[in-house]
A protein has these predicted regions:
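Fe-S-dependent hydro-lyases/dehydratases of central metabolism
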Residues: 4-224
Length: 224
């Protein structure tokens, strides 16, 4: 999943915002809505996030001017043709059941590049990935004050090899973050600790502001 953030800015929607002597760039959907006579008060927040996502990630290939124009026209009932659009989520949320195989796949791709004499470290998640280990801890101890501590300790003993592998992944891959067992279920950790309303990312020495969006490897991941 790729965050382009190198927008062609065909609709001249990139704006600057100054806060405490710091300059931030962002993509203003209002600027484009005016060009299509679209009343944004009638557009749901979820679709506004998609509109901003398209403007910010316009690379001319995955997202181009025609695609963006079509979406804005459709929201104004001026384009009824069904089309696919691109979406680049800010981050990916995984739990251990789905996350461990994904890390193994990334490791396998690095090995494949190394075997071909290429630089293996170019293989990294292109969007932020948070892997929350929340499906593993078994209840061996209970009704004592340090039950959680003992259960987590036992979990590390049982699955030492897996945790060593995940620790290697966190140390080796860019944009990969690990939440250890005992911190909470992935949805709780996502809402309380990981999610932000607005993210800041530095591109070419310039800070960009954009809303949070997430794809989860669970059927009911919640987005702020």
């Amino acid at each position: 999943l790729l965050q382009v953030m190198n927008s062609k800015n065909s609709f001249k929607s990139e704006k600057a915002l100054n806060i405490d002597n710091n300059t931030y760039k962002y993509f203003d959907i209002n600027e484009v809505a005016k060009q299509f006579n679209l009343n944004l008060l009638q557009v749901p927040i979820s679709l506004k996030i998609l509109l901003e996502n398209l403007l910010r990630n316009e690379d001319g290939e995955s997202v181009n001017k025609d695609m963006i124009s079509s979406v804005f026209r459709s929201l104004n009932n001026n384009d009824n043709e069904k089309k696919e659009i691109s979406f680049f989520p800010t981050r990916v949320l995984m739990q251990d059941f789905t996350g461990v195989p994904a890390v193994a796949d990334l490791a396998a791709m690095r090995n494949a590049l190394k075997n071909r004499g290429l630089q293996p470290t170019i293989i990294n998640p292109l969007s932020r990935v948070d892997l929350v280990i929340d499906h593993s801890v078994m209840v061996d101890k209970y009704k004592i004050h340090n039950a959680l501590e003992q259960n987590v300790k036992k979990e590390f003993e049982r699955n030492k090899e897996r945790y060593e592998f995940l620790k290697w992944g966190q140390e080796s891959f860019n944009n990969f973050y690990l939440v250890p067992p005992g911190a909470g279920i992935c949805h709780q950790v996502n809402l309380e600790n990981i999610a932000k309303t607005i993210w800041i990312k530095e591109i070419n020495n310039q800070n960009y502001l954009f809303p949070d969006s997430v794809v989860g490897t669970d059927s009911h991941t919640t987005m702020v």
